[in-house]
């Protein structure tokens, strides 16, 4: 497709302004929650991040598509997707100021527009994204829609915060990814709420064998087979999972035989862990989605630049202070960015320490997690230890 062949399109904000532009994606009309990211690079990573499920993503970077899209099927030496965060695009649509009709990059195999058309994703350019973001910052995240000329109108727009989105992106059955061969390999049970490939990569490169379980799996019943439990990122409102994931995590926290099991949560996993501990979460006005957000480590006083993608936050004032205390705080809006247990090896972060795309300032948190598993195995794990049976399990998410 060329700029001369592009169809007209319209981007409408519910109860707000509408904008005329051009379509460079799939000829479909769709709706969803409108959110924005200020990230300068990494649009393939963002679009395939399960945390964006059901959302219309507005890019503030003025020019999008200039380095094309790499081959999404390429895998690394660990069998993980090398250039994408999952095997499919999860955004409902993308909105950009200017689309780069010509692209150039040594890894690119297709244009962003061609990729969107193949994936059935609406994409609209020629939009004043600066004005859109100013509106969202003042009015808060809202529902919206992208209508493409000649495309059938989409069904009634459904607010993704009202839907169990995690069930749509989580694996349906367990799968197993062996860690990098090391002198010692630790075993982790990962609760899949929509885990990104680079989170898995950050574990396996450190010699961690990862068994991934569905979001509603009773992790408490199998935690004794592992050296640690990990709770992943994911989309939507965490309160939806109070009777499934949160209830399972609460049993895990309360089990007297599992008091020293290391637990690490990221993003949605952070929120679910906080809910299981008895805290509350709140919906943010417009959320934090960027690669350059400063977070203060309250234990050291050091500031880190972090990658973030969330529309909900933990209310730190509701934490049970005899058990959990804040670990990180956002220096822009003072929202909570992490919690840690006062005596047990349990902590979580709202931001993404795996940083893809984005900075790797906080990748040391994965090293700390491995060290906690080393201590747990040496000091607390009961013998004989029976590992969870992984023979015959698939090595990729089952959808």
Curated annotation (Swiss-Prot):
Pfam families: CPSase_sm_chain, GATase. PROSITE patterns: GATASE_TYPE_1. GO terms for cellular component: carbamoyl-phosphate synthase complex; cytoplasm. One of its GO terms (biological process) is L-arginine biosynthetic process. Keywords: Amino-acid biosynthesis, Arginine biosynthesis, ATP-binding, Cytoplasm, Glutamine amidotransferase, Ligase, Nucleotide-binding. Its EC number is 6.3.5.5. Pathway: Amino-acid biosynthesis; L-arginine biosynthesis; carbamoyl phosphate from bicarbonate: step 1/1. It is found in: Cytoplasm. It catalyses: hydrogencarbonate + L-glutamine + 2 ATP + H2O = carbamoyl phosphate + L-glutamate + 2 ADP + phosphate + 2 H(+). The active site is at 267 (nucleophile), 352, 354. Its main location: cytoplasm. SMART domains: CPSase_sm_chain (SM01097). One of its GO terms (molecular function) is ATP binding. It is an enzyme of class 6 (ligase). Belongs to the CarA family. Small subunit of the arginine-specific carbamoyl phosphate synthase (CPSase). CPSase catalyzes the formation of carbamoyl phosphate from the ammonia moiety of glutamine, carbonate, and phosphate donated by ATP, constituting the first step of 2 biosynthetic pathways, one leading to arginine and/or urea and the other to pyrimidine nucleotides. The small subunit (glutamine amidotransferase) binds and cleaves glutamine to supply the large subunit with the substrate ammonia. This is Carbamoyl phosphate synthase arginine-specific small chain. The gene is CPA1.
């Amino acid at each position: 497709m060329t700029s001369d062949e592009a169809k007209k399109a319209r981007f409408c904000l519910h109860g707000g302004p509408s904008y005329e532009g051009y379509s460079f994606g799939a000829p479909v009309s769709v709706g969803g929650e409108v959110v924005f990211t200020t990230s300068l690079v990494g649009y393939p990573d963002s679009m395939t991040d399960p945390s964006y499920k059901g959302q219309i993503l507005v890019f503030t970077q003025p020019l999008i598509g200039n380095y094309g899209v790499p081959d999404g099927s390429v895998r690394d030496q660990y069998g993980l997707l090398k250039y994408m965060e999952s095997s499919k695009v999860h955004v409902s649509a993308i909105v950009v100021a200017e689309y780069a009709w010509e692209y150039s990059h040594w890894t690119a195999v297709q244009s962003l527009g061609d990729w969107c058309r193949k994936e059935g994703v609406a994409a609209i350019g020629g939009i004043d994204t600066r004005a859109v973001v100013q509106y969202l910052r003042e009015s808060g995240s809202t529902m919206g829609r992208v209508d493409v000329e000649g495309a059938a109108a989409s069904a009634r727009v459904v607010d993704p915060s009202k839907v169990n989105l995690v069930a749509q992106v989580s694996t349906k059955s367990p799968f197993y990814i062996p860690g990098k061969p090391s002198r010692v390999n630790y075993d982790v049970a990962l609760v899949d709420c929509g885990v990104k490939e680079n989170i898995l990569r950050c574990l396996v490169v450190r010699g961690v064998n990862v068994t991934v379980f569905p979001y509603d799996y009773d992790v408490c019943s199998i935690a004794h087979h592992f050296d640690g439990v990990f709770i992943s990122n994911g989309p939507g409102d965490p309160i939806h999972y109070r009777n499934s994931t949160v209830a399972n995590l609460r049993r895990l926290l309360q089990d007297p035989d599992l008091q020293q099991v290391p637990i690490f949560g990221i993003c949605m996993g952070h929120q679910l862990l906080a809910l299981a501990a008895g805290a509350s979460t709140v919906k943010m006005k417009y959320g934090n989605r960027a690669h350059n957000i400063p977070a203060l480590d309250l234990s050291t006083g050091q500031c880190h630049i972090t990658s973030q993608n969330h529309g909900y936050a933990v209310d730190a004032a509701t934490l049970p202070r005899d058990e959990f205390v804040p670990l990180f705080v956002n220096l822009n809006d003072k929202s909570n960015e992490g919690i840690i247990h006062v005596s047990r090896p349990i902590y979580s972060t709202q931001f993404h320490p795996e940083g893809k795309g984005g900075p790797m300032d906080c990748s040391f948190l994965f090293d700390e997690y491995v060290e906690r598993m080393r201590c747990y195995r040496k000091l607390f794990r009961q013998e004989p230890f029976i590992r969870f049976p992984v023979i015959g399990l698939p090595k990729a998410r089952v959808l």
